[in-house]
C-alpha cells in the first residue's frame, strides 16, 4: 500500500488553511460519495500512464471530465464525457452557485484534480477554496496546499501505484 500522506511540506505562514493529506482509501471513498463530481485534468495527463488511469477513473464512476490546457486531444475516442474549458475560467465558474455546469445540470460539489502544474492549480484553487463550497481532491503527484484534500509529494512510481489503488477501490 502506498503511503500518500507523506511529504506534505507546508510553505505557508501562520493561520493559513491548507489541505489535508489523504490516503488512497479516503480519496476513493470521497470520489464515490460525491453527488456531482467533476474530474479536472491538465496537460500533464497526456503522459500515457496518467491518461490510461484518468480514463479508468472517469469510467469507473461515470465522472465528466473538464479537460484544461492542451489535454483534450488525449480523450478523443476514449469513450468518456470530456469537454474543454480554460482552467482559470473554470475556477471562476465554480465559485458561482448558479453556474449550470458543463452539462447544464448545475454546479459541482466535488472536483478531482490530476495533471496540473502545482503553481498554476494552487492559484485557481485559492479562489475555489475561499469563495465556494466545492470540495477539491488532488490526486496529483505533488501536494496541492489549496485543495481541500491532497496526496503528498510522491515519486512517479508511487503516484502511479496510488492511482491504481484508487481505481481498484472505486
Swiss-Prot record:
Keyword Magnesium annotated: no
Gene3D superfamilies associated with the record: TPP-binding domain
Disulfide pairings: none
InterPro entries in the record: CdhB, DHS-like_NAD/FAD-binding_dom
Molecular-function GO term, any one: anaerobic carbon-monoxide dehydrogenase activity
Record family assignment: Belongs to the CdhB family.
Purpose: Part of a complex that catalyzes the reversible cleavage of acetyl-CoA, allowing growth on acetate as sole source of carbon and energy. The alpha-epsilon subcomponent functions as a carbon monoxide dehydrogenase. The precise role of the epsilon subunit is unclear; it may have a stabilizing role within the alpha(2)epsilon(2) component and/or be involved in electron transfer to FAD during a potential FAD-mediated CO oxidation.
Name of the protein described by the UniProt record: Acetyl-CoA decarbonylase/synthase complex subunit epsilon 2
Species the sequence originates in: Methanosarcina thermophila
Amino acid at each position: 500500500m502506498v503511503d500518500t500522506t507523506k511529504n506534505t511540506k507546508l510553505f505557508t505562514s501562520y493561520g493559513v488553511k491548507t489541505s489535508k493529506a489523504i490516503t488512497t482509501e479516503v480519496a476513493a471513498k470521497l470520489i464515490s460519495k460525491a453527488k456531482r463530481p467533476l474530474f479536472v485534468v491538465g496537460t500533464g495527463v497526456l503522459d500515457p500512464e496518467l491518461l490510461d488511469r484518468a480514463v479508468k477513473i472517469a469510467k469507473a464512476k461515470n465522472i465528466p471530465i473538464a479537460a484544461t490546457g492542451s489535454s483534450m486531444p488525449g480523450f478523443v475516442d476514449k469513450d468518456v464525457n470530456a469537454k474543454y474549458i480554460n482552467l482559470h475560467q473554470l475556477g471562476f465558474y465554480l465559485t458561482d452557485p448558479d453556474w449550470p455546469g458543463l452539462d447544464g445540470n448545475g454546479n459541482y460539489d466535488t472536483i478531482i484534480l490530476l495533471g496540473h502544474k502545482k503553481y498554476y492549480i494552487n492559484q485557481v484553487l485559492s479562489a475555489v477554496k475561499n469563495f465556494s463550497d466545492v470540495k477539491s481532491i488532488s490526486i496529483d503527484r505533488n501536494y496541492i496546499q489549496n485543495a481541500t484534500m491532497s496526496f503528498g509529494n510522491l515519486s512517479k512510481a508511487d503516484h502511479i501505484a496510488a492511482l491504481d489503488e484508487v481505481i481498484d477501490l472505486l
